[in-house]
């Protein structure tokens, strides 16, 4: 899929991924599928990646969501700070990654992905350094 292709296009090994700004709509359908995709792409390394949903703070910006979330991802890299996934209250057993629940944190990161998928069939991912 697009995450694997973004990593390949950027010349980044899956073990180098530090942070992913997920599409993260907070729905079972999206979040469980996106979690499974992250596991498929990153393997055992998936558990070490800070996976956040900035959509939890902005709401769904429809056509603007991908651009705004890419900016959030660039700022996270610049500031070495993973923003929180706010309103994270009831973990889904199928969603077993580090979602940075409710409180952001400083962390060392070199590479990050920003995912955008859904409405209209778009499916995009950008790798940033």
Question: What are the roles of these predicted feature ranges?
Answer:
Residues 1-129:
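Conserved "HGTGT" condensation-loop signature of ketosynthase/thiolase-family condensing enzymes
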């Amino acid at each position: 899929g697009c995450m694997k292709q973004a990593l390949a296009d950027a010349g980044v090994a899956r073990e180098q991924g530090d942070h992913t700004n997920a599409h993260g709509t907070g729905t079972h359908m999206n979040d469980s599928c996106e979690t499974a995709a992250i596991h498929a792409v990153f393997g055992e390394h998936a558990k070490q990646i800070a996976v956040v949903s900035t959509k939890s703070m902005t709401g769904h910006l429809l056509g603007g969501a991908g651009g705004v979330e890419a900016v959030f991802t660039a700022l996270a890299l610049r500031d070495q700070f993973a923003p929180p996934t706010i309103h994270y209250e009831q973990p889904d057993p199928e969603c077993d990654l580090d979602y940075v629940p409710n409180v952001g944190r400083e962390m060392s990161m070199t590479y990050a992905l920003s995912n955008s998928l859904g409405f209209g069939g778009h499916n995009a991912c950008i790798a940033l350094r």
